[in-house]
Structures are given as structure tokens and as C-alpha cells.
Amino acid sequence: MKKLMMIGFGAMAAEVYAHLPQDLQLKWIVVPSRSIEKVQSQVSSDIQVISDIEQCDGTPDYVIEVAGQAAVKEHAQKVLAKGWTIGLISVGTLADSEFLVQLKQTAEKNDAHLHLLAGAIAGIDGISAAKEGGLQKVTYKGCKSPKSWKGSYAEQLVDLDHVSEPTVFFTGTAREAAMKFPANANVAATIALAGLGMDETMVELTVDPTINKNKHTIVAEGGFGQMTIELVGVPLPSNPKTSTLAALSVIRACRNSVEAIQI
């Protein structure tokens, strides 16, 4: 039985916990110290809830982060320094190029691995493959309901309470999007890191009051030809800012960690 460490225990983490593969046992959950008692009451007593990686009393076979950018900054480097493998869902954190370099160096030094999970989008394998053959242009378009943009930088750019038609409120690079919309733009960062990079991948963000689902579109072209990928995703009922597919992406990564044949 392989052992899992989970960083974070919010809506997405709870979904992942409920659907873990049978051959993977959750043994450690890392949360802020103020949340330890609450989280411990929600999970089995044989799961150790801790506030710091150094408090772990064993060696996890896989670590997943489902806690947001602040948690990545706090814990990811410690995980890699121990030689462990970690999967990140909050890929937008890596818009900080200096931090990305630090993680890469730590992983290389300690024979550790950093997995960037696909999250709420499809086609990352295709973008990554196209990069090998002369990827020239990539644009990501994200469209969500006003409710899904609440609490983000979008509130400073458009009146979410009174928008009456689809409205583009941001156009810029993936790096700019990831820094300004940390809770919403992990998809843009993932596409960028799979392809042309944070400064060459363009992003267009839209609010649409007529929809209640998240729409993601990738348009790419290069030596391989042309590619258009469109996905309409359902948000998690417990958190409208989180894609159900993003949670499923984490579950898939957990399953891959225990399976001999991986897709």
C-alpha cells in the first residue's frame, strides 16, 4: 500500500479524498495550524494532520498540493529537498520565474520530481508534443460566470453585479494572468509551461452572465499544424471557483502514482 501526503484540505481536497484509488492510503494532511483540529475531525484518526512538512513521521510515496499558491511557496521546496515527488495543481505559482528556478534546482539536487497537473483543461499533452516540432502561437481564452470571478482582480476591471453580456475584461500574457488572477488562472500557467512559456502565451479572460459553467479554449499553431481545443466544465458545487475536472485531474495523478501503466 503506497502512502500519500496531501497539502491542503478544502473543497477540492475533500473531493480527492473521497475518490482515492484503493492502493493509495492518505497518511498525512498539511494545513495551517489553526485548521488542524477542524480537519482532524473530518478524516480518519489514522491520518496525521500537521502544519509543517518537518512534522511528517514517515516517507510518502506521493505528495499532492491542493491548497493554493501560498501553500506552494511554503511547502513545495521542503518536499523536493527531501527527495519526494510532488504534484502541483496551483501551477500559477510558477509565474514567479525565480521561484520556478529554485524548485527546479532543488529537485535536481535531491533527485526529486515536480509534476504539473493538467487541472481544468484538456490537451496539455498535445501542446507539449507540438512544442517539440516548432510551436509558434498559443492563445488561451477563459470564460466564466460573474459568480466564478467574484473575489478576484476581475472585480476591479468590470462590474460583475451588473454585467449584461459577455465582456472581455483582460488581455495579456500568461504570466500577467497568473499573477493577477491566482485563484482562476492556473490553466493559463499550465498551458504556458507546456508550450511557449509565460511571456509568449496570450490570454483572454471573459465574464458571461448567460452561462453557469466554465469555458476554456486553446488555439495553437505551428509546424505540427493547427489545434483548437474547447472544454465546457462544471464547477464543484462546494466551490464555484474550482473546476470539477481539476479535482479529477488530481485523482488521476494519484491513480497514476500506483499504476504500472500510466496514461
UniProtKB/Swiss-Prot annotation:
InterPro entries: Asp/hSer_DH_NAD-bd (IPR005106), Asp_DH (IPR002811), Asp_DH_prok (IPR020626), L-Asp_DH (IPR011182), NAD(P)-bd_dom_sf (IPR036291). NAD(+) binds at A120, N186. The active site is at H216. Gene3D superfamilies: Dihydrodipicolinate Reductase, domain 2, NAD(P)-binding Rossmann-like Domain. Pathway: Cofactor biosynthesis; NAD(+) biosynthesis; iminoaspartate from L-aspartate (dehydrogenase route): step 1/1. GO terms for molecular function: aspartate dehydrogenase activity; NAD binding; NADP binding; oxidoreductase activity, acting on the CH-NH2 group of donors, NAD or NADP as acceptor. GO terms for biological process: NAD biosynthetic process. It comes from the Bacteria. Transmembrane segments: none annotated. Keywords: NAD, NADP, Oxidoreductase, Pyridine nucleotide biosynthesis. Its EC number is 1.4.1.21. It catalyses: L-aspartate + NADP(+) + H2O = oxaloacetate + NH4(+) + NADPH + H(+); L-aspartate + NAD(+) + H2O = oxaloacetate + NH4(+) + NADH + H(+). Belongs to the L-aspartate dehydrogenase family. Specifically catalyzes the NAD or NADP-dependent dehydrogenation of L-aspartate to iminoaspartate. The iminoaspartate product is unstable in aqueous solution and can decompose to oxaloacetate and ammonia. This is L-aspartate dehydrogenase. It comes from Acinetobacter baumannii (strain ATCC 17978 / DSM 105126 / CIP 53.77 / LMG 1025 / NCDC KC755 / 5377).
